[in-house]
Design a protein with these regions (language model features):
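Periplasmic-binding protein-like
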Residues: 7, 83-91, 156, 160, ...
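Bilobed "Venus flytrap"/periplasmic-binding protein-like clamshell domains
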Residues: 7-10, 21-34, 88-139, 156-158
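Short, solvent-exposed loop/turn elements at domain surfaces
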Residues: 10-15, 71
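Alpha-to-beta junction loops
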Residues: 37-39, 55-64, 108, 136, ...
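Short, charged, surface-exposed secondary-structure boundary motifs
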Residues: 72-74, 120-121, 141-146
């Protein structure tokens, strides 16, 4: 079986220094393959095209920390959730970043494209803030660190991983999670 994943979403799926795709999602997927007594390989795909690639049979299932949403359920089926997550903002430690419409007005906030974080920003703040969407969270973090963004909204575990890095040392979580019941499942073709 071919496991589809993004390979750019640490700590859940990433490419290590040996070029191997590793992370929590792959640990789960490989354990399932072992339990089913089948050989599995890993195929990476850009996030934007990962569901169309699954439906085009480029891989057999997705282990990619994918949120189970009504919109996605129209295109694919999901297993029961294997973990839950939430969305939380990060910004510079010394900033006065607050999470309310008045405080965020005029701020530039980054999120990964085609994710619940990007959707949440658009649904909750729309035109009140400048939303910048990225192909990967890593690109959003680069712009945050270079001063092109005031904050980033992403899964709290993914943000936490970046905050532990050298690049994230001057940043911190801001406020409480804004969405804290994100159910993550393995996606399958219908």
């Amino acid at each position: 079986l071919k496991i589809g994943t993004e390979g750019a979403y640490p700590p859940f799926n990433l490419i290590d220094s040996n070029g191997e795709v590793v992370g929590f999602d792959l640990d789960i997927a490989k354990a399932l393959c072992e339990k089913m007594k089948v050989e599995c390989s890993v195929v990476t795909s850009d996030w934007d095209g990962i569901i169309p690639a699954l439906n085009a049979k480029k891989f057999d299932f997705l282990a990619a920390s994918m949120s189970i949403t009504e919109e996605r359920l129209q295109a694919v089926d999901f297993t029961d959730p294997y973990y839950t997550n939430g969305l939380q903002f990060i910004a510079a430690k010394n900033s006065d970043f607050k999470i309310d419409a008045a405080s965020l007005k005029g701020k530039v906030i980054g999120a990964q494209r085609a994710t619940i974080a990007g959707n949440w920003l658009e649904d909750n703040y729309g035109k009140a803030i400048d939303i910048k969407l990225y192909d990967t969270n890593e690109n959003a973090y680069l712009d945050l660190a270079s001063g092109r963004l005031d904050g980033v909204l992403a899964d709290k575990f993914v943000n936490w991983e970046w905050l532990k890095s050298e690049a994230g040392a001057d940043y911190e979580f801001k406020g409480e999670p804004v969405f804290d019941n994100d159910k993550i499942g393995i996606a399958l073709r219908k």
